[in-house]
């Protein structure tokens, strides 16, 4: 299966009639493995800051998580495993695997729990596969 198929079929899938606003799978070096058409144009330093928070949990809390210039308030995640952010009625979930970051961005009516489930389920599967 191609990386794009993981984004299209697993991240952008429909859940209770809803789906993520955008999603991507990125390498730890900020390279795009696959992304949805409307995934934000991000800066490498934004991805570096996200990776730093996985190594040093809490480092994003004072400044917020930025993706494509959009600031998300960091909310409870799982240190070193998952980072979650909130902005208005939407938010972001980032799951780290050995080689990649799985990123899902959502807005209402999708719920944070639905976004977390989609992103973390794929991340867990990729970890089991050695990625």
UniProtKB/Swiss-Prot annotation:
Keyword match Cytoplasm: yes
Function summary: Binds to actin and affects the structure of the cytoskeleton. At high concentrations, profilin prevents the polymerization of actin, whereas it enhances it at low concentrations. By binding to PIP2, it inhibits the formation of IP3 and DG.
GO cellular component: cell cortex; cytoskeleton
Subcellular location: Cytoplasm, Cytoskeleton
Keyword tags: Actin-binding, Allergen, Cytoplasm, Cytoskeleton
Keyword ATP-binding part of the UniProt annotation: no
Subunit record text: Occurs in many kinds of cells as a complex with monomeric actin in a 1:1 ratio.
Coiled coil start-end: none
InterPro entries the record matches: PFN, PFN_euk, PFN_sf, Profilin_CS
Pfam family, one: Profilin
Family of this protein: Belongs to the profilin family.
Domain of life: Eukaryota
Gene Ontology molecular-function annotations: actin monomer binding
Name of the protein this chain belongs to: Profilin
Species assigned in the record: Ananas comosus (Pineapple)
């Amino acid at each position: 299966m191609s990386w794009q198929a993981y984004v299209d079929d697993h991240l952008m899938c429909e859940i209770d009639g809803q789906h993520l606003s955008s999603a991507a799978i990125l390498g730890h070096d900020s390279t795009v493995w696959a992304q949805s058409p409307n995934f934000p144009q991000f800066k490498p330093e934004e991805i570096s800051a996200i990776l730093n928070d996985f190594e040093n949990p809490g480092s994003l809390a004072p400044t917020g998580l930025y993706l494509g210039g959009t600031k998300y308030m960091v909310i409870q995640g799982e240190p070193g495993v998952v980072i979650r952010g909130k902005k208005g009625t939407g938010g972001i979930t980032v799951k780290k695997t050995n080689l990649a970051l799985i990123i899902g961005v959502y807005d209402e009516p999708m719920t944070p729990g639905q976004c977390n489930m989609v992103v973390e389920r794929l991340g867990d599967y990729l970890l089991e596969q050695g990625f």
